[in-house]
Amino acid sequence: MAALLVRSVVASVVDPFLHLSRLAVKPRVFSSFLLGTLPRAKPCAEVRSVLCGRPLPTLLPSLGFKTKGVIKKRCKDCYKVKRRGRWFILCKTNPKHKQRQM
């Protein structure tokens, strides 16, 4: 109880001095002192076995637009769309064909 009181008093005294300038950053000594030690939870055996038992699914990266000065249709399924004042090439069969005009 006394430690909590000391922490709150130190925090209230030190805090105004740290906000005097925009570039002031709280020193790690004060922040670690004010936070104290946080209890660490250990995962139980059931959770550990579930996580280790099967591999996590991998996510496929989404493809972005290629930004070009001159855009071209690269296959018969590519089509042009004008959005936000720019021309875009979109393709349903091959997403690698997506292009954006500079």
Curated annotation (Swiss-Prot):
Entry superkingdom: Eukaryota
Keywords associated with the record: Mitochondrion, Ribonucleoprotein, Ribosomal protein, Transit peptide
InterPro entries per record: Mitoribosomal_bL36m, Ribosomal_bL36, Ribosomal_bL36_sp
UniProt feature coiled coil, ranges: none
Residue ranges of the TM segments: none
GO biological process: mitochondrial translation; translation
GO cellular component entries: mitochondrial inner membrane; mitochondrial large ribosomal subunit; mitochondrion; nuclear body
GO MF term set: structural constituent of ribosome
SUPFAM superfamilies xref list: Ribosomal protein L36
Main subcellular location: mitochondrion
Pfam family, any one: Ribosomal_L36
Subcellular location: Mitochondrion
PANTHER family assigned to the protein according to its UniProt record, in alphabetical order: 39S RIBOSOMAL PROTEIN L36, MITOCHONDRIAL (PTHR46909), LARGE RIBOSOMAL SUBUNIT PROTEIN BL36M (PTHR46909:SF1)
Record note on quaternary structure: Component of the mitochondrial ribosome large subunit (39S) which comprises a 16S rRNA and about 50 distinct proteins.
Family as reported in the entry's similarity comment: Belongs to the bacterial ribosomal protein bL36 family.
Protein name: Large ribosomal subunit protein bL36m
Originating species: Mus musculus (Mouse)
Gene: Mrpl36
